[in-house]
Every structure is written in structure tokens, then in C-alpha cells.
Amino acid sequence: IAIRKRILQRGLSFAPQATIANGDHIYWDLHTWQGEQAGELSAQGRQSNFDFANRVLGGSNEMALKLAAGPQIVPLYGTTFRSTPIYFLQDDHDHWENDSPLTYPVPWFQLQLARTTQQLYYPEFLPDANRSVGLPYSTTSERGELSESFGTLRYGDLLEVLLYDVRRTLNVGDLNSVFLDRTVENWLAERTASTD
């Protein structure tokens, strides 16, 4: 944490207009993918004692999530970016696993861990009039039209950066393997070709 914090402080010393935190916010792999115990719960997975058949929020699962994720996120970010907008993307470790073809698609419980970690510790992407309706994990709720995986960073007419995480719809293990969901691919192509 100390090294990552120094790197962030160094970046902030340049007074950026915005910051993108590009995933791997937590390291708490539930399974091990090498050696004799491949596919089995890791030491951290056993320690967390998650009830994979139960929901994440409420009870022991929420407590285990907070004990694992909180100490890795809160001390690092805290109020450091209170004057600089920060956009959070998720990566493999944020789904509580190291990247492996054996882990896709992301198991339901681990997807719920990732979603809950995001809801508790870093914001979803704000509404965007140019974001396609129907993108996966983008919803309309009492909190507005938020997206867990797709956002846009704009700097006037100079720059538009499309931010996206395809990990939740990535499927490399089946005959119908897909890297980009068709709706996501269309959104990326439309925004890239757009002049507005």
C-alpha cells in the first residue's frame, strides 16, 4: 500500500485534471490455479469463509468482504482524490481471482463480490447521454442511469476517452467465445466514428 500511495501522490503532484484507476484494486484470490491444489480454495479463500450459496450483502459474507477489501482500498484512496475526479475500472483481481481461462465467465458469486466491492468503495460511472441503452451492467434505478462497467471521460471538444470493462461478459472457454459483447462493440464503434 505504501508504494502504491507514493506513486499516486507523485501522479497528483502534476495536478492532473482527472485520474483513471485501472483495476486490480484488491488482491484476495479465492482459488489457486497452480500446483497440486489447482482449482481449490486458496489460503485466503479458506480464511474468508465465504458462503457461496448466500448473498454478499448482510451477514458474514459482507463482513468477510469488508475485512478483505477495505484495508486495501480505503488507506490507498481515502480522501486523496477529493479535488481530482477519479474513474475506477475493474480488472481480474477485482473479481476475486487472478486471470485464468478457467475462470471465465466469472462465477456468479464472484461477480456479486465485485459488484458489492464497487458499490461500497468506488463509484459507478455517471449518466452519459451518449452511452448506448442496453449495455451490460448499466441500469436505471432510483440512483439514476449508472453503469458499473462503461463510462466516458470528456475534456471539452478536445478529448473523449471511452472507459470499459469487458470482464463481466468475456467468455473464452466455450465454443461461442466472445471478447466484446455485440452491444459493447457497437457502442465503441459508434462513439469512435462520432464527431460530436
Where is each model-derived feature located?
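Metal-dependent phosphoester/phosphodiester hydrolase catalytic core
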Residues: 1-196
